[in-house]
Design a protein with these regions (language model features):
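Intrinsically disordered, low-complexity Ser/Thr-rich linker and spacer segments
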Residues: 47-50, 55-72, 113-126
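Short, solvent-exposed alpha-helical surface patches in non-cytosolic proteins
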Residues: 35-46
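Primarily a LysM-type cell-wall glycan-binding module
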Residues: 1-35, 63-87, 109, 115-118
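Short beta-strand-to-loop junctions in surface cap/lid or active-site-entrance loops
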Residues: 161-168, 176
Length: 365
């Protein structure tokens, strides 16, 4: 964890401010460690005149980013008293501890205590770090959520996969193929959180019952396909070998703003152009446009499937029998439903339906 001091700016400060907000402090999520943020740190920590954030302070604040704590049961404890102690609800505690007898808590046992706020924020920039905290928190809140990895990125970051349901029909979702499109990651994570919450509370979600959905379908989600690139764009990666190499790559394309215009993985390969289908055609087009070497965007790579993220997504897709895949992007405001002359059965109907509930327009690819 990065040590923070007054005057610091950036993504780490924004995460600090998010934790402070959830701890009850009135601070803006502006990423600037100013006087109000300093005062909030002092108040939460109970230490006047000391607003540096080091390991001990982060350890106090991390539960507000992961969304839960653990409580060791003592004599006389009940779910009600534990909920009151930590300002949360009995229902949240029960959902997180499905195998525990609420009427006979064992002294010394550990209770997972979800804190009483939505876990997936829509107000901060996303990185691999925040995504990992959220996934950990979702697992704690909803222990029946199935979590795994499909591989690792160039820098060794896990490529997380989430599974909801155990039905025979498989549906795939993914987000943040492109580094500067990370707003798609909280879209998927918020979908997961709301669906799990509705399932736990036995409520309907968007006119359907999650229990029935999970019996008929298995939903597989990869919320952060390009973690290294996202970390670069959103300010988590600011030094070291990979950062310096990205700077060198970007210097060859001065018309593309750095890092905001970076779409590729950390090696300068556009993951969305890495798949065997149409690769030769894409190579011809992109090379003619000047993207014939590692670049912030549109470089197809030396060969198809030449970087770990695209290989992981390719293998993951081949290992499943997806009836539908939804790949979330930004910038275009269109829904691609057809690839060249290949049109999956029902694809246009699905795209037209989605266009009715979103601002995007259906279009061929």
């Amino acid at each position: 964890m990065k040590e923070l001091y007054p005057g610091d700016q950036g993504i780490w400060v924004q995460y600090l401010q998010l934790a402070l907000q959830r701890a009850g402090q009135q601070v803006m999520l502006d990423g600037i460690f100013g006087p109000k943020t300093c005062a909030a740190v002092e108040k939460v920590m109970g230490s006047s005149g000391k607003c540096a954030v080091k390991e001990a302070q982060w350890n106090r604040l991390l539960p507000f980013l992961r969304g839960y704590i653990t409580h060791e049961v003592k004599a006389g404890d009940t779910f009600f008293s534990i909920a009151k102690m930590h300002n949360t609800t009995i229902e949240r505690i029960m959902h997180a501890n499905p195998g525990m007898d609420a009427g006979a808590l064992q002294i010394g046992s550990t209770v997972v205590v979800p804190l009483n706020f939505p876990l997936v924020s829509e107000e901060v920039l996303y990185t691999s770090l925040l995504t990992g905290w959220i996934i950990e928190g979702l697992m704690a809140r909803y222990p029946y959520l199935q979590v795994g990895t499909i591989g690792r990125s160039v820098m060794g970051t896990p490529l997380w996969s989430l599974r909801l349901g155990n039905g025979p029909v498989e549906v795939g979702y993914n987000a943040s193929f492109h580094a500067n499109e990370s707003i798609t990651t909280p879209v998927l994570l918020k979908f997961v959180e709301r669906l799990l919450e509705a399932y736990a509370d036995e409520h309907m979600y968007e006119e359907l019952y999650p229990e029935r959905l999970f019996e008929e379908y298995s939903l597989y989600l990869v919320p952060l396909v390009n973690p290294d690139g996202v970390d670069l764009v959103n300010g988590l990666l600011t030094e070291g070998f990979y950062y310096r190499r990205a700077v060198r790559i970007a210097s060859g394309f001065p018309d593309i703003p750095f890092p905001d215009g970076w779409k590729a993985n950390i090696q300068g390969v556009d993951l969305n152009l890495q798949f065997p289908a149409g690769w030769d055609m894409a190579k011809k087009i992109k090379f003619e446009q000047g993207y014939n070497r590692p670049a912030p965007r549109d470089y197809v790579g030396q060969t198809p499937l030449s970087v770990p993220e695209s290989i992981a997504m390719f293998d993951f897709t081949r290992n499943h029998d997806f009836s539908l895949i939804l790949a979330y992007h930004t910038q275009g405001e269109v829904i691609y439903w057809k690839y060249l002359d290949e049109e999956p059965e029902g694809a246009r109907r699905i795209a037209e339906y989605l266009s009715l509930i979103h601002i995007s327009e259906p279009t061929r690819h």
